[in-house]
Curated annotation (Swiss-Prot):
Protein name according to UniProt: Uncharacterized protein CPn_0441/CP_0312/CPj0441/CpB0457
Homology family: Belongs to the chlamydial CPn_0441/CT_007/TC_0275 family.
């Protein structure tokens, strides 16, 4: 059960490590844990991610870096032996570090992005979510989660993102499970949906392979009872409405997207809690800025750079 909770709000990648912040492995419910609920129904997770400065492909003398901070508090409330409710609240902050090595005029079309994030570079959300799970069908695990990402400086519908996930997991064999579902996001003048589909395969007692689009592409190796080594393909995404300013980008909408390959080390000092560190290379990234109705979008791609970070989870 708690494996589900840890992954629902992770970043989560990295909202945003994946297209949807509230999902990492939405079907990781442990049936035995639900039959014998642990005495600690609460958990907390924190994560930090930094992408080093990268050069833009078509904006000379300009670079962009990215930092993300997030924290989540989660609660499981069992209703019956096979079902229950999920609650979570959290915080996500992102710092867009757009720089230029030469002076740029605010009226220069190539300088709009730089000027926009010189005005305000830090943006954040408060996360609120409610969900439910059931294990009543043999070999099936189902969950539904609804969440809102609210701008704490402008608590208005037009400044938020609203997301929902319906997911199912079928335990085909002791080693193989299949994931099915749908992810939906609406808000900021855009509605998008992604299929949630893939498999998780435990090749040996030490090695697990995950290929679940779009939330979990990883290889995990249990080297000792307290240490796991892993490789993963990470998706980073942060979409936000800009604040009012004196530029033509005032109250526009920006979206940062990143794709990274990482190596990680996870230490588990006691069951259900862990500390993880990761390091890797950012590839194929871009940032876009649109007007306040999500029209007239301009995208800027940038080159590769290193990234690193860490996360921790604790039960109590």
């Amino acid at each position: 059960m708690f494996k589900l909770l840890f992954h629902i709000a992770a970043f989560a990648g990295h909202v945003l490590s994946t297209p949807i912040f509230i999902v990492q492995d939405a079907c990781g419910i442990d049936e035995e844990a639900c039959k014998n609920p642990p005495p600690r129904p609460f958990s907390a997770q924190v994560q930090y991610l930094k992408v080093n400065d990268a050069k833009f492909k078509k904006l000379p003398h300009q670079t962009i870096g990215y930092r993300q901070y997030d924290g989540t508090f989660l609660c499981t409330l069992p209703i019956t032996e096979h079902s229950g409710l999920l609650f979570s609240t959290g915080y996500i902050g992102a710092d867009i570090q757009w720089k230029s090595s030469l002076p740029i005029s605010e009226t220069d079309p190539n300088g709009l992005g730089w000027a926009t994030f010189q005005d305000t570079s830090f943006y954040n959300y408060v996360l609120l979510s409610l969900g439910a799970y059931t294990l009543s069908l043999k070999n099936w695990q189902w969950s539904i989660i609804l969440s809102g990402l609210v701008d704490p400086k402008n608590i208005e519908m037009g400044y938020g993102l609203y997301q929902g996930v319906l997911s199912g997991k079928y335990q085909a064999t002791e080693k193989l499970s299949a994931i099915f579902g749908v992810i939906n996001e609406t808000g900021l003048h855009q509605e998008k949906a992604w299929p949630l589909v893939g498999v998780s395969y435990k090749a040996t007692d030490q090695l697990t392979l995950n290929c679940i689009y779009p939330v979990n592409f990883s290889i995990d190796y249990r080297s000792t009872s307290v240490c796991n080594l892993g490789l993963a393909y990470r998706l980073t995404r942060f979409r936000k409405k800009l604040y009012k300013n004196h530029l033509i980008s005032s109250r526009g909408i920006f979206e940062y997207q990143g794709r990274e390959i990482e190596a990680n080390v996870k230490l588990t000092p006691w069951p259900g809690s862990f500390i993880k560190g990761f390091y890797g290379w950012s590839i194929g990234n871009d940032i876009s800025i649109a007007d306040d109705h999500n029209n007239n979008k301009t995208s800027h791609t940038f080159k590769t750079s290193a990234f690193f970070g860490g996360s921790a989870v604790m039960n109590f």
